[in-house]
Amino acid sequence: MNKIHCHSSEEMPELMDGSVSLTVTSPPYWNAIDYDRHAENKGQYFRTRNYSNGFDDYENYLNWTAKIFEEVLRVTKPGGYCGIVIGTVLYNGRHYPVPFDLTSRLVREGWEFHQDIIWHKCTAGVKRAGVTIQKPYPGYYYPNIMTEYILIFRKSGPAIYKTIDVEDRKKSPIAINKLFTMDVANNIWHIAPVPPDLLDHPCPFPEEIPYRLISLYSYTGESVLDPFAGSGQTLKVARHLKRKFVGYEIIEKYVKLSEKRIAEPLAIREYQLIAEFAKIHWDTPSGERQSSQVKRIPGRRKKSPKNLTPTFL
């Protein structure tokens, strides 16, 4: 444990059966980002991914990914969890339901589907609604893609709290604060992505995601796995939350990046995002500013000047 292995996670001989409590990871995007090319030259990664190891076909990609999570199932202890951050993919005019197809395969392998959480990126996404604005007729509707899925799977077995004595449970309390009640408690999480070029990796997920998942699905001292370690976000957070960690990454540059970042301070942002709802007349013209038509839902407090929480309409 507490190591990053530089080889594929298709086989993880370093890990014994049932040795991992939780996996938090995000598989490579299918046909979206060329990680190899980015590793060679940060400025050169493309929206089309041509895999050198031969799984550029969608079915091959799904089978390859499912094979890795079959190995993850082996090393997960009974009752342990696996959190996967994954989104749908647009490619050559088609919209591929990657999260749903992968879920079907993982359930067939023996994973129990536990929860789905929607990651609302808030400030980033694939902008497509312009088509509808330019041609406002049925059949031209293509919504902006502002979300990814956080899929939670569980290995059959006793509930994890039943294997932890009462005193040890008290060492891993979940913070029940305003952020929890207004965001974490729901299955839609409003988390801004990592700003571009902040890390030398094309698509790191924000540290808030592994922070929440590790806090919610594991206890202090347990082991956390990331089979697609990338920039080391999961491993870094696991260490700070006093969990053991183990990662797998095939690109040596990213292994070195992860090893460096693990000891860095957490980058959890001081101000987190929540959704504050407001009412607007259903037929208000686009772009029209008529504050008199916007009515706040009773019971919601107004924003103060120091409140950096945006309102999502």
Protein language model features and the residues they cover:
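Post-kinase regulatory C-tail/linker adjacent to protein kinase catalytic domains
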Residues: I274-P285
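Core catalytic lobe of class I
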Residues: M1-L257, L273, G287-Q290, V294-L313
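C-terminal helical cap(s) of enzyme catalytic domains, especially alpha/beta-barrels
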Residues: E259-E270
